[in-house]
Design a protein with these regions (language model features):
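Phosphate-group recognition and catalysis centered on beta-loop-alpha active-site segments
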Residues: 1-139
Length: 139
């Protein structure tokens, strides 16, 4: 098993109003983090944003960073679009777990992490802020 940290929406040291902004995500990537991002697809345009579509991006932006992104599709059109790509994406609402497009278990923060899963926001129990711990099996 391997531990790794994934920045949650670009956050690495607490929640800020900058989360999901493209330059903020790039800052986290530049520091060596993978980043979980939230995307929306509305009117043939892609956006970053958690509760609503805020920052317009395009597929090239995602492609240029694809080795570092964990893409959370926030609406059904975003999920349908991602299914046409080789990007690493997932969808969940209130499900206990979901499976990413790369076959990794993504556990909802409301449940105890599973072995070999991504434990989302474990700081609720261990005191870390806005970081996602990942347990990935190395083959």
């Amino acid at each position: 098993m391997k531990h790794m940290l994934i920045s949650h929406r670009g956050n690495i040291d607490g929640k800020t109003l900058l989360e999901n902004q493209p330059s903020y995500i790039d800052d986290a990537i530049d520091l060596g983090y993978d980043v979980e991002i939230d995307i929306w697809y509305i009117g043939d345009k892609l956006y970053l944003g958690h509760d609503l579509a805020q920052y317009q991006i395009d597929l090239n932006w995602l492609e240029e960073r694809k080795s570092k992104l964990w893409i959370h599709c926030k609406n059904h059109p975003a999920l349908e679009l991602m299914c046409e790509t080789d990007l690493h994406y997932f969808w969940h609402d209130e499900d206990d777990v979901t499976i990413t497009s790369k076959g990794i278990i993504w556990a909802h923060p409301k449940i105890r992490p599973l072995k070999k899963s991504i434990a989302v926001l474990p700081e609720d129990t261990i005191g870390l802020w806005m970081i996602v711990w990942v347990y990935v099996r190395i083959i």
